[in-house]
Amino acid sequence: MITGKTISLPLSVIACLGAGASQAAACANQTDCLKSASAKVSQTLTPKVVPVFGDYPKLYIHDSAANEDYTVPDTTKQEFDFYTNKTSFNLPRRSSIETREIASISPAMGFTVLLVEKTRDNTVSNGGSTLSLLSSNSNDAYLSFALGAKPSSSGQKWSFAKSLLQGNKAQTAYWQKPWDMNLLGPTGDFSGTEWIYYTFTPDGKVRIDRFAPYTYFLAFTAYQWDEAVLDGGFPHFPFDTGTPTNRPQSVTFGSVGPWLIGAAGAPGQTPPTSEPIEALPGFEGATIFSAPLSMKEVIAYQNSLRGSYFLDVDMLPCNSGQYLSGRISTPCGTGSPGNPPPNINSVAQHRISTNTNR
């Protein structure tokens, strides 16, 4: 059974897609791609709730690399995510947690960061769920970049890459909108949880893959999968005052420092946002991969976290059709975005066949 959007591709775009496929030639199916992606996991940052007899539960964020638990402030809010059966943390304003070890990543090699966030029914004014990387090129550490989502009542529309302008120290921040914020979601029920993969490559690019799951008939998961590539990675590109007329000169990042969870403030600098924020609305965890994930590896890893009969390693993002013309397959079905195939039972039994040439 064939499912997906169908559109016509010019030869130049097909060549580009073919080049991307050759880079990911090391894996070709769900099993192989999951194995290669899992081998790149170097660190996880996971919220934990530990019951304490005769007292309130203790809240921690567990760092797998340092094998340590970081205590969060007593005023941290908890939101239980029934879709994932996990607890998300909303840190109080101006709060952040710095990991005790240097991040085990290299800008020269590239890396991927996965954020898991609960956004539906979990929004706060001026909120922004963020994870940042500190530079250790001077005694005054500063934020090199921050990652996260600015949630709204329809959280899947508001995923951002947040980058900080750099001088001697970062003083200001700007939001980059990676895709059309008015994209329609699938016609099922938005599950309220989002998985966002930020893949940094040595050429100074960051690829963002956002998966927002929707449920059908209380059993089947379908994804709204959006993707964008931005100049927001390493080396970092700051803009002078005013509208830029060409590509700015790169700024040397310096040595990699620790991660900062929350990013409402950093040592030796002013807060990166103009107003105080609740640092982590809906933070369910972060996974750091020590090397960049290919598109197929991202899909395979996501399927291992929340499997879907409508997501296959040979597919392309749902928003591909906005920029390409040709015949491709996405997880968003054949009708309006997100509609599953009409015969769900047959898909459940036989999975999906695709017609994507990569």
From Swiss-Prot:
Region (Disordered): 331-358
Location(s) in or outside the cell: Cell membrane
Transferase keyword on record: no
S-diacylglycerol cysteine-type lipidated residues: C16
Domain of life of the organism encoding this protein: Bacteria
Chief location category: membrane
Record lipid sites (N-palmitoyl cysteine): C16
UniProt membrane topology term: Lipid-anchor
Signal sequence residues: 1-15
UniProt entry tagged with the keyword Cell membrane: yes
GO cellular component: plasma membrane
Biased amino acid composition, Polar residues: 347-358
Keywords, in A-Z order: Cell membrane, Lipoprotein, Membrane, Palmitate, Plasmid, Signal
Name of the featured protein: Uncharacterized lipoprotein y4eE
Originating organism: Sinorhizobium fredii (strain NBRC 101917 / NGR234)
